[in-house]
Amino acid sequence: MTAVAPRVDGHVAPQRPEPTGHARKGSKAWLMMTTTDHKQLGIMYIIMSFSFFFLGGLMALLIRAELFTPGLQFLSNEQFNQLFTMHGTVMLLLYGTPIVWGFANYVLPLQIGAPDVAFPRLNAFGFWITTVGGVAMLAGFLTPGGAADFGWTMYSPLSDSIHSPGIGSDMWIIGVGATGIGSVASAINMLTTILCLRAPGMTMFRMPVFTWNIFVTSVLALLIFPLLLAAALGVLYDRKLGGHIYDPANGGSILWQHLFWFFGHPEVYVLALPFFGIISEIIPVFSRKPMFGYIGLVFATLSIGALSMAVWAHHMFVTGAVLLPFFSFMTFLISVPTGVKFFNWVGTMWKGHITWETPMIWAVGFMSTFLFGGLTGIMLASPPLDFHLSDSYFLIAHFHYTLFGTVVFASCAGVYFWFPKMTGRMMDERLGKIHFWLTFVGFHGTFMVQHWLGNMGMPRRYADYLDSDGFTTLNQISTIFSFLLGLSVIPFVWNVFKSWRYGELVTVDDPWGYGNSLEWATSCPPPRHNFTSLPRIRSERPAFELHYPHMIERMRREAHVGEHDLRAETTQSPTPAEVR
């Protein structure tokens, strides 16, 4: 890897891009608060998300410390309840979801050749309302009764005013609604940008895989976040006005579970699909090959999006109120398109010239971790096994293998991959690999043993256990490795700060040398409206064709460009140079 990629066409490497137009005046803080630039907002989303991630991780360390040994009890039961409630909320709604929009904001307009997103002010509104919602939820810790303590799933009757009377619970519900509004705003923006602002020649089946994944994610977000907002307002109505919507006497507890999980399981794919897209961008670059099975990968993404709306009730097997065969079958079925994605990723790496830069290491770490989480998910799709393992630490381990394995590993891969594009500087490879191995070892040491804890019968959300239960040794192993996992953020944060200021300067469009999509056809960082000129888009690899024009004919001979692109080539109007 070099920050100055080799060129074969006599091209002179450009210097850092000069600012275009007049610089805006005012303090940096004011400019940040009033910006509508999608690139700045994307970076702000990513910084905000990782800030909440660090807070959520601190809560997790307190939870693990409490469980180190029986009878420790340095936290009260009430404090423990508040911590696991806020930990789950922060990680899902304040880290996992906003960082999706962070990468989408920065990368997606570049990948489709757009000068900005469709609605810049709506974009800024989505960011700030999400941030305010997150602060409101966390401010519950400062109220007399403390933060929300009914679990991040907000099950009734735990969430009613009798069992959770504090104002912190009300602030949590309002914060959830605010983050939902922010996600809807971002989803509208991304959909409109993709449908209306693609560059000439950028057909739907020439879009990068990451853009396709954001497209499907945005559709899912528009379907589920309004439901979450309406359902959460119903809880607030019950608490403040005595609505009895979720009163257990009226079947309200089961109603809430249906409403919540109809949001909750597609939300898992809102968190997963964009990061599948990030991995699909990274693997071809460091395998030195085009994506194997591009069309199949796109249709696998569409299939996952469709099937994700039909599996919510597998979270409710133990209620006895759902049709077990249907939801079990649909859960097994959704693993098929996910398996197709793995087949395509492995096929892309197969016989490629793989180089192990930091983004590629994180991508392979994602694949191994998520694969294990997916296999345990197949186990839980079987109702008899689910009856035994439900609400145990086996479920906690599965959930973290799928979501931590997806969101954290792939978001770190994305940061290392696109950091040169965002800042014009390279990150430190040695620190990046230290960060990876601390995270990989710490994560697997923390959560692997929790499968056995769950199978032995340890329930989730318990603040203590008996020495005679036999859980002590495995809990101590899990806690020790959790602190190793916590330490992994230190080299990451230092790497970001150091590289932002002192990293190796990038003077070419594509510092990795083999980028495929359009973001690698503009400077690092890009100018205000992204491009000073656009290359001709003749396939799903326009940047690669720009940098390696002598490879175009060979790629067509080897069928690395689909038939739809060849047909489009024959029907395109000739350029002025071709006419002359």
UniProtKB/Swiss-Prot annotation:
Q: Where is this cross-link: 1'-histidyl-3'-tyrosine (His-Tyr)?
A: 265-269
Compartments, record wording: Cell membrane
* Main location (coarse class): membrane
- This entry's Enzyme Commission designation comes to 7.1.1.9
Question: InterPro entries, alphabetically?
Answer: Cyt_c_oxase-like_su1_dom (IPR023616), Cyt_c_oxase-like_su1_sf (IPR036927), Cyt_C_Oxase_1 (IPR000883), Cyt_c_Oxase_su1_BS (IPR023615), Cyt_c_oxidase_su1_bac (IPR014241)
Provide the topology term for how it sits in the membrane.
Multi-pass membrane protein
Q: Which GO terms describe its cellular component?
A: plasma membrane
Q: Which controlled-vocabulary keywords does the entry list? A: Cell membrane, Copper, Electron transport, Heme, Iron, Membrane, Metal-binding, Respiratory chain, Translocase, Transmembrane, Transmembrane helix, Transport
Q: Pfam families, from UniProt? A: COX1 (PF00115)
Q: Where does Fe(II)-heme a bind?
A: 87, 400
Q: Which GO molecular function terms does the record list?
A: cytochrome-c oxidase activity; heme binding; metal ion binding
Asked whether the UniProt record includes Repressor among its keywords, one would answer no
Q: Does the keyword Heme apply?
A: yes
Cofactor or coenzyme needed: Cu(2+); heme
The EC category is translocase
Q: Which residues bind heme a3?
A: 398
Physiological role:
Cytochrome c oxidase is the component of the respiratory chain that catalyzes the reduction of oxygen to water. Subunits 1-3 form the functional core of the enzyme complex. CO I is the catalytic subunit of the enzyme. Electrons originating in cytochrome c are transferred via the copper A center of subunit 2 and heme A of subunit 1 to the bimetallic center formed by heme A3 and copper B.
Q: Which family does it belong to?
A: Belongs to the heme-copper respiratory oxidase family.
Indicate what this protein is called per its UniProt record.
Answer: Cytochrome c oxidase subunit 1
